[in-house]
């Protein structure tokens, strides 16, 4: 809920990013960030929920930025760096986006692990623990992640409950955040 107090205008968002994330960023870099992470509700997180869950004008924008800068950009950077050096698998949860007001939230991907309704991750965790491979007879085919083929097991509410997708969402924004992290390490 901290996002409610961070910013209510585009200028406040950019001031917050500059003050707390990139105090040495150029105006051009901040303008690029402003373009890649717009305040348009339909383009914010949780994604693919339209204007739902837009508690404030900047809420979904800040959620998209924070999700990418804290989770997706570092994850993708390390998965690409380790590609071809060790076995990798990735997953994306698109479950629980219908939670009123907030949509999916940090940690919501863990609920299905302990649910009777979904067993994919639970079974995959057991297979991985025993075999260093999440694939098994009760898990949908889960191809390895590589830089050339960044496959992810994507989890959905409803049917189908899973699908294999590519880890190519928001590529330009995630790559830009990675370049900022390298240039301005925290």
Each model region followed by its residue ranges:
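Substrate-gating cap/lid region and adjacent catalytic-acid/histidine neighborhood
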Residues: 1-118
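Alpha/beta-hydrolase-fold serine-hydrolase catalytic core, especially in secreted/extracellular enzymes
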Residues: 83-86, 120-186
């Amino acid at each position: 809920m901290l996002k409610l107090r961070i910013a209510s205008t585009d200028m406040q968002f950019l001031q917050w990013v500059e003050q707390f994330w990139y105090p040495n960023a150029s105006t051009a870099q901040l303008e690029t960030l402003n373009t890649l992470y717009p305040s348009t509700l339909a383009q914010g997180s949780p994604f693919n929920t339209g204007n739902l869950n837009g508690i404030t004008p900047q809420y979904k924008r800040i959620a998209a930025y924070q999700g990418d800068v804290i989770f997706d950009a570092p994850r993708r950077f390390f998965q690409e760096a380790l590609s071809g050096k060790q076995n990798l698998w990735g997953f994306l949860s698109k479950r629980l986006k219908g939670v009123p007001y907030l949509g999916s939230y940090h940690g919501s991907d863990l609920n299905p692990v302990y649910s009777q309704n979904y067993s994919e991750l639970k079974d995959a965790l057991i297979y991985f623990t025993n075999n260093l491979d999440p694939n098994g007879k009760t898990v949908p085919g889960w191809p390895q992640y590589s830089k050339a083929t960044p496959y992810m097991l994507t989890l959905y509410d409803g049917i189908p409950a899973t699908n294999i997708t590519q880890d190519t969402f928001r590529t330009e924004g995630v790559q830009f955040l990675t370049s900022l992290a390298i240039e301005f390490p925290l």
